[in-house]
Amino acid sequence: MRLLFLVLLVLLGLIQYPLWLGKGGWFKVWDLQRQVAAQHETNDGLRARNAALEAEVRDLATGVGAIEERARSELGMMREGEVFVQIVPPGTPVPQPAPGAPGQTASAPRR
C-alpha cells in the first residue's frame, strides 16, 4: 500500500510538472501576460505620439499659423516691423561686438 501511494505521488508530480513549469505552463503564461500588458502600455504611448504628430502635420499642411510659430521658435524669425527684445539676467557679461562687425562705426564714440 505504501509503495502504491509513493508511485501515485510520483505520477501526480510528473503530471503537475508540465502544468507549472513546462513550455505552456502557468509561469510562462503569467510572464507572457505581463509582457503583453507592458507592450500595450508602450503601444498606447506611441499611439498618442502618432496622433500628436499627425495633428501637427495636418496643421502644417493647412495652416499658416503653425508654420509661422515654427519659424519663430526654431529659426528665430520675426515679422517686419517687430522689435526683438532679449532680457539678460543681472550680472551676465555683455558681449562686445568684434571690430569691423556690421552696425559698428569706425568713428570715435560720441560724447
From Swiss-Prot:
UniProt-recorded name of the protein: Cell division protein FtsB
Source species, domain of life: Bacteria
Biased composition range(s): Pro residues: 90-100
Membrane-topology annotation of the record: Single-pass type II membrane protein
Keyword Lipid metabolism in annotation: no
Cytoplasmic side: 1-3
Keyword vocabulary terms for this entry: Cell cycle, Cell division, Cell inner membrane, Cell membrane, Coiled coil, Membrane, Transmembrane, Transmembrane helix
Major subcellular location class: membrane
Coiled-coil stretches noted in the UniProt entry, renumbered to this chain: 31-62
Family: Belongs to the FtsB family.
Keyword Transport: no
